[in-house]
Amino acid sequence: MKTKNISTILFILFASFLFSQTIDVMSFNIRLASVDDGENHWNIRKDKVKDLISYYEADFVGLQEAQKPQIDYLLDNNSAYGFLGRPRTDEANAEFSCIFYLKNKYKVLEQNTFWLSENPEKSGKSWDAAYPRIVTYALFENIKTKKKVWVLNTHFDHVGVIARQKSAEIILEKIKTLQKKRNVPVVLTGDFNSVESDSWMKPLFENLQEARSNSVTKPYAEKATWNGFKFNEKPSEQIDFIFSSKNNTKVLKYRTITDFYDYKYPSDHFPIVAKIKLK
């Protein structure tokens, strides 16, 4: 009888592990390699960005403003990560909203990129957007547990108000479509160029759970995520967010990473990271 009880307990524990697991998710606008950045140019800070990503070793990292040479450098110097995504245009050094993932831990079952425009399947922009904007997404499977998760990453336009409103609508509709295809947890990362109180963000906050405001433990460090490379000024706005599906995820921890070096920041945005339980 005692042996049977132990077997039952072990089975329950194994089943609990199998059907729920935690992932660490990071969103990080690394700032493109602009010649106008002076002492904050990519060539000066790239080691700091690389070291930060390597140290925190999130399961998934949604990058914004990443250009191909930057992506190549980060991958060449961190063998733990795989990469997926495509640039928003065919121009040289066009920006990616790509996803890094721990390649020895996850398998990519499906991936794609779509545009935040009236024709999402075709490169271009719509409404009042200054630039074409994209969403890269993938369905990942944990190689050991077989647990699956959709991960989406985006970067909203910084000018177009209508474009940002429509972008939120398009993403929510896409998430519904993905969940109909495979009803598993969903995570959305991005630089939304918006604050929580902006009207177009309301549908995202209502239909998904935002990581900072829903964290079980008290969020760590700053709320603001945009620092503008201004080390001596207190950041005031959170425009980078991590969201997850309400019915099958639980946010356990959230942190804004305010690491710095020589009184400078690795990027003009603080990376954010959340520990999320997948149910």
PLM ranges: what are they?
Residues 61-64, 85-86, 187-191, 210-213:
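Active-site neighborhood of phospho(di)ester-bond hydrolases with catalytic His/Asp-centered motifs
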Residues 105, 162, 166, 176-186, ...:
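Metal-dependent phosphoester-hydrolase catalytic domains
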Residues 27-47, 116-130, 157, 228, ...:
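Acidic/histidine-rich helix-loop elements
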Residues 31, 67, 155-157, 192-195, ...:
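Catalytic metal-binding/acid-base residues of hydrolase active sites
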